[in-house]
Curated annotation (Swiss-Prot):
Residues 81-136 are annotated as: Disordered. It is an enzyme of class 3 (hydrolase). Keywords: Cell membrane, Endonuclease, Hydrolase, Membrane, Nuclease, RNA-binding, Transmembrane, Transmembrane helix. Its EC number is 3.1.-.-. One of its GO terms (biological process) is mRNA catabolic process. This is Ribonuclease Y. Signal peptide: none annotated. The keyword Nuclease applies. It is found in: Cell membrane.
Length: 523
């Protein structure tokens, strides 16, 4: 009984559960349907609202497009209006130009017609002149024939006679004019030059010491000579090879002589040798070390000398390499005169004269200091010291006035400024003053012979004499061959030839002597 009851209860429970599930499913479906209906209604509302909003937005965009289209059309109309106005103005200008061209065309036509008329008149006058010229030529020919008959001279003979007479008169007048002009120019120039040069010289004084090709190094004792020579002469050979200088060791007590034509190498050898003597250790390795130190010391010394030179002169802004080259001039000589001292003196003289003439004093000093800069390298580089100096000044971008002063101070080119002329004058003053330079006997004799040869090469010269150590040449002429006027021209020609062919310090006086003697004996 109990098992049947349990089954019944279980079955009832299952049925109740099934019925509950069916009822729950039905309720769930109903609820889902209601939610779906509400969602559908909401979606339809959203769609409807979107449609309304889209319609509104469409209307707004259409209105904006219409406004934009209206503005664009208005802008186009304004631009078209402006373009029409500009075109009208251009048409007006073109019309005006066309009218102007028409008027010019008319004017040219009138001028062309006028020129044609003038050409016709000129042709007519030319024809008349040709006819008249023929008549005159015929008349002149008749007159020539008549003159030849009367004068008993042909046309060529008369022409030659007139030319000879005219040439004689012109020669006399030219000689007189040359003498008067030279006298006036010399008088005025001498007065001004004497004032300038005297002032420049009295404000610039310097000592000039002649250099030689040898240097003497003192030794503490004669035993040092053997140490300098070294075993089998290896020390002296090493020193000579490294410096390029000859060491002369003779019987002179406590001294050795360094001989060489390059003063810089000779100075390097002197410094190295003195350091070796002071150190006491003399062997090839030590010699090489001391020579290297001497070269470095020499480079520093050259730079310091160059800097001191530009400081003494009072110039600045010079390229460092050019300053070192300038310092090398201290170890160069010209006819026994120290080139750097000479350059400093020229710079100061040029500056004084430039100040008197109102020129740029600093630029004048710069040109004077650098005028012989090429001599620092003329033994190492091909070319004259003038050419080398111009190349150096151009390389280091010196002013054009300085370059021209370097190029023209020996007369190789024409000076283009007053400063260039002053540099040449100062160079001559510094070189020509007594004691500044020495000259070899061979060169001196050659210059005297050349002076006399130049004078004797001219026609009408009897003989000549170079006197006063070559500062004057006296020319004796044959009076029957040369007149007084021709003597003036002869002196000028000899002067020009001397200036062209000879190099000399200062100036040379040319004196032409024409003497006529008449002797009669009373019996």
């Amino acid at each position: 009984m109990s098992s049947v009851t349990l089954v019944s209860i279980t079955l009832a429970a299952v049925i109740a559960l099934a019925v509950g599930l069916l009822i729950g499913f039905a309720l769930q479906k109903k609820l889902h349907q209601n939610n779906l209906d509400r969602a559908t209604q909401t979606a339809e509302g959203i769609i409807e609202a979107a449609k309304k909003e889209a319609a509104t937005l469409k209307k707004e965009k259409l209105l904006e497009a219409k406004d934009e289209n209206h503005r664009y059309r208005t802008q186009l109309e304004d631009e078209l209006k402006d373009r029409r106005t500009e075109v009208q103005k251009s048409e007006h200008r073109l019309n005006q130009r066309e009218d102007t061209l028409d008027r010019r065309d008319d004017t040219l036509d009138r001028k062309e017609q006028s020129l044609a008329d003038r050409e016709a008149n000129l042709n007519k006058r030319q024809q008349q002149l040709d006819e008249r010229e023929q008549d005159i030529s015929s008349e002149i020919s008749k007159q020539h024939t008549e003159l030849e008959r009367i004068a008993e001279l042909t046309h060529e003979q008369a022409r030659q006679q007139i030319l000879d007479q005219t040439q004689s008169e012109l020669t006399h007048e030219r000689a007189v004019m040359i003498k008067e002009s030279e006298d006036e120019a010399k008088e005025a120039a001498d007065k001004k030059a004497k004032v300038l040069i005297a002032d420049a010289i009295q404000r610039s004084a310097s000592d000039i010491v002649a250099e030689t090709t040898v240097t003497v190094v003192n030794l503490p004792n004669d035993d040092m000579k053997g140490r300098i020579i070294g075993r089998e002469g290896r020390n002296i050979r090493t020193l000579e090879t490294l410096t390029g200088i000859d060491l002369i060791i003779d019987d002179t007590p406590q001294a050795v002589v360094l001989s060489g034509f390059d003063p810089i190498r000779r100075e390097i050898a002197r410094i190295a040798l003195e350091k070796l003597i002071q150190d006491g250790r003399i062997h090839p390795a030590r010699i090489e070390e001391m020579v290297d130190k001497a070269r470095k010391e020499m480079d520093d010394r050259i730079r310091e000398i160059g800097e001191q030179a530009i400081f003494d002169v009072g110039i600045h802004n010079m390229h460092p390499d050019l300053i070192k080259i300038l310092g090398r001039l201290h170890f160069r000589t010209s006819y026994g005169q120290n080139v750097l001292d000479h350059s400093i003196q020229v710079a100061k003289l040029t500056g004084v004269m430039a100040a008197e003439l109102g020129e740029d004093v600093t630029l004048a000093k710069r040109a004077g200091l650098l005028h012989d800069i090429g001599k620092a390298l003329d033994h190492e580089v091909d070319g004259s010291h003038v050419e080398i100096g111009v190349e150096l000044a151009t390389k280091y971008k010196e002013p054009k006035t300085v370059i021209n002063a370097i190029a023209s101070h020996h007369g190789d080119v024409e000076p283009t400024s007053v400063i260039s002329v002053l540099v040449a004058a100062a160079d001559a003053i510094s070189a020509a003053r007594p004691g500044a330079r020495s000259e070899s006997l061979e060169n001196y004799l050659h210059r005297l012979e050349k002076l006399e040869a130049i004078a004797n090469s001219h026609a009408g010269v009897d003989h000549s004499f170079a006197i006063q150590a070559g500062r004057e040449v006296r020319v004796i002429v044959q009076p029957e061959k040369l007149s007084d006027d021709q003597s003036v021209i002869l002196a000028r020609d000899i002067r020009n030839e001397i200036e062209k062919e000879l190099e000399y310090p200062g100036h040379i006086k040319v004196t032409v002597i024409r003497e006529t003697r008449t002797v009669e004996y009373a019996k």
